[in-house]
Amino acid sequence: GEAWTRATEQEKRREGNTTELLVTQVPGERPTVVITTPAIGHVPPRPVLMFSCVDNITRMQVALMHPLDVHDIAVTLNADSRALRSHWFVRENGTLLESSRGLSGIDEIKQLFGAKTLTVDTGADNAAGKLTFNIDGLARVIAPLRDACHWAGE
C-alpha cells in the first residue's frame, strides 16, 4: 500500500545500521514531512515506525513485514516507563498499523515526547507482538511536521 511503501522506501536511504529518526521534507502548498525509524533488534527487512504529515493529515503508523489478519487491534504504547493504552487500525491488507488521525492521534504522539524508546505491544504472540523503536529527540525532530500539519496552538 501507499503508506507502507512510503515508510520502506525512506528506510532504504538509511546509511549503516543506525536507528536515529530519519526526516524527509517536500515543500510546497501542502508540504509533506515523513519521519521514520526501524524496529530495534530485528533483522532486515525491519518493521518501520513512521510519523507523517501528508495532505495536511498527521499520522503515526507502523509498516509491518508480516501481515496481521485483523482490522483493528488494542495496543499498549510503552514510552520509556509510561504505558499508554490505545486502539489502532490495521490497514493496507494487514501490513500497516495506524493510530487515530487528527487531534487524538496528535495527542498520542505528544505523549511520546521526552521518551528515548517506544515499544508498540499488540499482545500478539508473533514477530509483530512487541516492536521497539528509538524515538530519542522526537519532540525536536518533529518540529517541521508540526508546522506542515498546522498543529493547533503551536
Segments from the language model and where they lie:
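A generic "folded-domain core" signal
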Residues: G1-E154
